[in-house]
């Protein structure tokens, strides 16, 4: 899995002008699923995300997790994280998982996250508009195959 984590003051995702999910303080996750991803990748990503200390404590140090601040997650599927830009000027997305597998793993990922924090989400495969107010900004890239 490839994920982009953005610390936000607020974020929302809309489809056809209607809000599908919205959060206040927390994390916006852009989630890409690869063809070789499995339950271990999901567990690793969930463990990292819910325990990562990227929120400020009373002294202004990044020392608190999303659980500590009782924050929320907005999860948005994004196969374009698997873009291959080596040839030409049009990205290829053949490195992303097929939609059936990706949808299944994305759903499972969100269900596992929801065991720890409130999770709002977009709609898998939909054309979505994402709005956010970055906090920091703090943006972290997580690749479950690089640990």
Curated annotation (Swiss-Prot):
GO CC annotation terms, alphabetical: cytoplasm
KW Endoplasmic reticulum (keyword) present: no
GO terms classed as biological process: D-amino acid catabolic process
UniProt keywords, alphabetically: Cytoplasm, Hydrolase, RNA-binding, tRNA-binding
Pfam families: Tyr_Deacylase
Main location: cytoplasm
Motif (Gly-cisPro motif, important for rejection of L-amino acids): 136-137
Top-level taxon of the source organism: Bacteria
DNA repair recorded as keyword: no
Reaction(s) this enzyme catalyzes, per UniProt: glycyl-tRNA(Ala) + H2O = tRNA(Ala) + glycine + H(+); a D-aminoacyl-tRNA + H2O = a tRNA + a D-alpha-amino acid + H(+)
Record GO terms (molecular function): D-tyrosyl-tRNA(Tyr) deacylase activity; Gly-tRNA(Ala) deacylase activity; Ser(Gly)-tRNA(Ala) hydrolase activity; tRNA binding
Compartments in which it is found: Cytoplasm
Gene3D superfamilies reported for this sequence: D-tyrosyl-tRNA(Tyr) deacylase (3.50.80.10)
Enzyme class: hydrolase
EC number: 3.1.1.96
HAMAP family: Deacylase_Dtd (MF_00518)
Family: Belongs to the DTD family.
Record note on quaternary structure: Homodimer.
Function: An aminoacyl-tRNA editing enzyme that deacylates mischarged D-aminoacyl-tRNAs. Also deacylates mischarged glycyl-tRNA(Ala), protecting cells against glycine mischarging by AlaRS. Acts via tRNA-based rather than protein-based catalysis; rejects L-amino acids rather than detecting D-amino acids in the active site. By recycling D-aminoacyl-tRNA to D-amino acids and free tRNA molecules, this enzyme counteracts the toxicity associated with the formation of D-aminoacyl-tRNA entities in vivo and helps enforce protein L-homochirality.
This protein's domain notes: A Gly-cisPro motif from one monomer fits into the active site of the other monomer to allow specific chiral rejection of L-amino acids.
UniProt protein name: D-aminoacyl-tRNA deacylase
Gene expressing this chain: dtd
